[in-house]
UniProtKB/Swiss-Prot annotation:
One of its GO terms (molecular function) is carbohydrate derivative binding. Belongs to the GCKR-like family. MurNAc-6-P etherase subfamily. This is N-acetylmuramic acid 6-phosphate etherase. Its EC number is 4.2.1.126. The active site is at 81 (proton donor), 112. The lineage of its organism: Bacteria, Bacillati, Bacillota, Bacilli, Bacillales. It catalyses: N-acetyl-D-muramate 6-phosphate + H2O = N-acetyl-D-glucosamine 6-phosphate + (R)-lactate. CDD domains: SIS_Etherase. Residues 53-216 form the SIS domain.
Amino acid sequence: MNHLTTETRNIQTMHLDEMNLSDALKTMNQEDQLVPKAIEPVIPNLTKVIESAIQRFNNGGRIIYIGAGTSGRLGVLDAAECVPTFNVSPNDIIGIIAGGQKAMTVAIEGAEDDAEQGAQDLKNIHLQSKDIVVGISASGRTPYVKGALVYANKMNAETVALSCNVHSDISKNSNHVLEINVGPEVLTGSTRLKSGTAQKLVLNMISTMTMIGVGKVYDNLMVDLRPTNQKLIHRSIRIIQDVCDLNHQEAIELYEKSDHNIKIAIVMHLCSTTQQDARLRLKQNNGVIKQAINT
């Protein structure tokens, strides 16, 4: 492991324990600022990943994140957030963590070293060739993730390796390679820091841009959100008010007439049509508002 960048000592923090608190925080902040720039070189590869994810999602495939420890938790987090944000099923975007759900809050000893379980966890969700599997591992050598990617390849699923070391092991088992070289961690080997931040940013990009590509966004608005609480209900009404140029009360009335569906409300108003017709237009255009209003 000595050759791994994530295990190398950071020369900026060699005496971290002797720094005063303010200087230590400034140093940590400076190191964190390196992360977004480290992602920039992989944007061409990331573009191909997202294009594939859009195509597969539109053909009934799923996006599956799989990892161990911090990497696994980040995948589960991103998948979970997609349900209310984009009104997708929990079965459309899935996060799997080594050791199961208990591992979200408690470290499960040895879980990351079980390559066979990585494959088994994909078998348990009935992996299909139309799915895309994103293996997440800061080191790029986690056996659990390697096992999952090897199995995914056998099933002819699309595979993506997301790591924070160049020439990583998991990259050898994937169709797409995303290697984010964030450099040594502030605290040597603590990949929950810069590596975790990089992984979170990349997962944000994958899920957000894929959902835009499948019609879940109008301009920069979350028009397919699931209004499950008061905050989201108010946001839904504000979106309708903004897009349709209505006052607050008019937006509320349209929201009610649309059966609490932002997309339907927008199409109803912009096309001066009924709820039934708006629903049909959206269905015929895969839920993409701008296509529906031009039909």
